[in-house]
Amino acid sequence: MLTALLLSGCMGNNLGEVRATEPLQTGTFQKPYEQLAACTKQRIETDSWIFGQPIVQSSQDTNRPLIRVYAIYSRSTLFEVTFQPTHSAMTTVEYRRGYDGHGTQDQTWAIIEYCSRQAAPPTPGADRRP
């Protein structure tokens, strides 16, 4: 019984396991990848979730232009969303779900779509005249 408890507690905990899975949903958006990732991360952090508030983290790949946003709840990786620019100034987004992330895909994808329609934040100092 202890083994079963330990195994069930470890299911889905490993971010590497989530990253190794095929994406459940993929899309391309006409928004710079940094802006889309930042907006998505902020909305995931502030939206209400049926299970409670997840811990949301992000990382930028050092070898290529790729941002990863992932949510953790109760020491388990719920999902990861990756943002990567394309050659045509678009962003490819991929959603992967962890073992305990059931019920998060629709809400997460709705956040991504919402963020893709938002205006770009103003550039600091853009309203100044030389």
Task: Walk through the language-model features, giving the residues of each.
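Post-signal-peptide N-terminal segment of Sec-exported extracytoplasmic proteins
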Residues: 25-67, 78
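Bacterial Sec signal peptide processing site at the extreme N-terminus
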Residues: 4-25
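Mid-chain, structured segments of secreted extracytoplasmic proteins
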Residues: 61-94
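Sequence contexts marking disulfide-bonded cysteines in secreted/extracellular proteins
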Residues: 11, 38-40, 114-116
